[in-house]
Amino acid sequence: VLIGLGLSGGSFMVVLAAFTRLVPEDRRSWSLGLATAAGSMGQFLFAPLGQGFISAYGPVTALVLMGGMVALVPILALALTGKGDVSDEPEIPVREAIRGALTHPSYLLLTAGFFVCGFHIAFITTHLPPYLTDLGFSGGLAASAIALIGLFNVIGAYTAGVLGGHQSRKYLLSGIYFSRAVAFSLFIILPTTPFLVILFSIMIGLLWLSTVPLTSGLVALMFGTRNVGMLFGFVFLSHQIGAF
C-alpha cells in the first residue's frame, strides 16, 4: 500500500502536469517526451542496480540504499520553481471541469485508449517472461526481452514527444495503437524464435510509453493547462485499471 501511494505521488500524472504548466506550448510536446524518456531510463538503470545491491548486500540493505536515493528527491525538488503561470486561462470550478471532460467524446475515447494501453503493458510485463520459459527458452532471453523493451522505450517516448510538436498528436497516437496490434499479431502468427523475440521486444519498446506524452499533450490541448493534472489523472486512472 505504501509503495502504491508513493508511486502515485511521483507518477507521470504529477510530473507531466508540472511540465505542461511550466513549458511553453511550442516546446511542450518535446518536454513531455523528454520527461517520459527520463522516467523510462531510470527504470532501465535502477532495475539492475537494485538487483546488484541485493546480490552484494542482501535485500534489507538494498532496500535501505534504494530508499535513501528516493529520499533525495524531495530535497532536490526544493530547487524547482513551483506552479507554472496559468493566469491567462479562465478559472474553472473543479466540478465544472470534470463535467466538461466526462461529456467530451474525444476525452472519453482517449481514456478508453489509455485503458487498453495499461492492459498491454501489464500483460506483456507479467506474461512474456513465463511464456518464453514455457516454450523452452532460457531465462536470459526472457530477461533480455524485458531489458530491450525498457531500452527502446526511452527512444520511443522521446521520439513521440518530438513528433508531437510537429505532427497531429491524435494521428500519431492512432498509429501507435495500430502498430501495437500489428506487432502482437505477428508475434502470435509467426513461429517463436529468439530473433522474433528480440525483434518483437524492440518494436514493443518503441511503442511502450510513447503514448504517454501524446496523451497528456492532448488533454492539455483539449482543456488547457489549469486542470491538466486532475484531468490527466483520470485518464491515468483508466490506464492503471486496465493494467490491474
Q: Language-model segments: which ranges?
A:
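Intracellular juxtamembrane helix-capping segments at the cytosolic ends
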Residues: 9-23, 210-223
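Glycine-rich segments within core transmembrane alpha-helices of 12-TM secondary carriers
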Residues: 27-47, 236-244
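Helix-loop-helix hairpin linking two adjacent transmembrane segments in secondary transporters
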Residues: 35-82
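A late C-terminal transmembrane helix in Major Facilitator Superfamily
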Residues: 43, 209, 222-244
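Juxtamembrane intracellular "pre-TM" segments in multi-pass secondary transporters
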Residues: 86-109
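Extracytoplasmic gate region of multi-pass secondary transporters
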Residues: 104-160
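C-terminal transmembrane helical hairpin of 12-TM major facilitator-type secondary transporters
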Residues: 149-152, 166-218
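Helix-to-loop junctions at the C-terminal end of transmembrane segments
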Residues: 157-169
